[in-house]
């Protein structure tokens, strides 16, 4: 959006139709059909104290991978709750969450824990959206439905230097007696970053989005349902002049082209009204337009997910025509058939930590 005024600085499963679970078990729609009998049994994978005591947590040593859940299907994860006690700064960036479906060795979810819940700069703040929320105090919640037919395995790895003193978790899932519908798609979440983005000093035109910041790339059939993103400004000025661009099924030019970063995240005019957090969109952290300032934003396409039958490349410009070199951190969320394309390698832990990169200093 061009400013007109100065503003402050899932593999499709082939179960027989006669043995399918209802759509309601997959939907997760609150208060929908509460008067009707359910066709699932609610189960929970949890850190509770098996001795009957009150030590309802796990510790995680440096380098250790803790299995949070390893359950047979069919089922649907309906809610994930986590809270963490750790002495280490930026532990939200140093703990890595992974989720695997159907015995795959390549994770369908791979992201630092904080980033998965929209805390992309490694610090806690409170907000409430429909699929994700952070409650008081430091309570991380996900309500994304995550179906699995044969197996669901979730892990967390401590890539920090300090022992996690307490990692509490509850993973609620619906154990099903019948197969999932044949067109069921699997949940995916992918972390990306650019620290910094590479500024392009060209003619101010960007038609094909070659140098855009990429949220995700996928092959197969599925639909994109949203993104959380955090920005650290490396120079004064407005970071969000860049347009969102979605390339569906190999299109060379954007299938969907936006008008500005704050417009995509459903704000306007540089988010000048201040921070906000709504059910499907928000900017819960809004800085000034100055070097070193931090921003966090999110958008969920729950009304009309962006569909693809072969491939999708979801991206956004970093500044107008990619003319800025700020630091971007993001997690994209989507559903698709399995197998999925292997994700890019997760950056080393030290590279994931927010730090200022002034122009000319890198």
Regions found by a protein language model. Give the residues of each.
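Bacterial N-terminal signal peptides
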Residues: 5-14
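Beta-strand-centric surfaces of beta-sandwich/beta-rich domains
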Residues: 20-362
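Sec/Tat signal peptide C-region and signal peptidase I cleavage site
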Residues: 15-19
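N-terminal secretory signal peptides that target proteins for export/translocation
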Residues: 1-2
């Amino acid at each position: 959006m061009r400013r007109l005024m100065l503003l402050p600085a899932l593999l499709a499963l082939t179960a027989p139709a006669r043995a399918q679970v209802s759509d309601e078990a997959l939907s997760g729609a609150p208060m929908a059909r509460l008067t009707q009998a359910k066709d699932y049994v609610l189960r929970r994978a949890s850190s509770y104290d098996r001795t009957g005591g009150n030590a309802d947590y796990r510790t995680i040593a440096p380098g250790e991978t803790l299995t949070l859940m390893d359950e047979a299907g069919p089922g649907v994860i309906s809610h994930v709750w986590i809270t963490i006690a750790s002495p280490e700064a930026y532990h939200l960036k140093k703990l890595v969450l992974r989720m695997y479906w159907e015995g795959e060795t390549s994770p369908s979810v791979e992201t630092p824990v904080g980033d998965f819940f929209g805390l992309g700069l490694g610090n806690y703040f409170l907000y409430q959206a429909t699929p994700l929320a952070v409650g008081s105090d430091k309570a991380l919640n996900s309500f994304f439905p995550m179906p699995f037919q044969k197996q669901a395995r979730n892990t967390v790895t401590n890539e920090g230097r300090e022992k996690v003193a307490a990692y509490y978790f509850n993973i609620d899932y619906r154990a099903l007696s019948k197969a999932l519908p044949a067109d069921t798609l699997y949940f995916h979440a992918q972390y990306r970053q650019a620290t910094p983005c590479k500024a392009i000093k060209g003619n101010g035109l960007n038609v094909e989005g070659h140098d855009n910041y990429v949220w995700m790339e996928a092959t197969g059939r599925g639909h994109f349902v949203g993104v959380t993103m955090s920005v650290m400004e490396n120079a004064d000025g407005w970071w969000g002049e860049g347009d969102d661009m979605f390339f569906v099924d190999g299109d060379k030019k954007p299938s969907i082209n936006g008008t500005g970063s704050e417009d995509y995240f459903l704000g306007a005019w540089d988010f000048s009204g201040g921070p906000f957090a709504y059910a499907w969109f928000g900017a819960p952290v809004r800085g000034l337009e100055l070097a070193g300032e931090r921003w966090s934003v999110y958008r969920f396409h729950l009304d009309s997910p962006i569909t693809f039958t072969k491939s999708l490349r979801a991206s956004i410009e970093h500044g107008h025509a990619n003319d800025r070199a700020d630091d971007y951190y993001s997690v994209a969320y989507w559903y698709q058939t399995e197998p999925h394309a292997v994700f890019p390698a997760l950056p080393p832990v030290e590279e994931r930590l927010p730090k200022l990169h002034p122009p000319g200093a890198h």
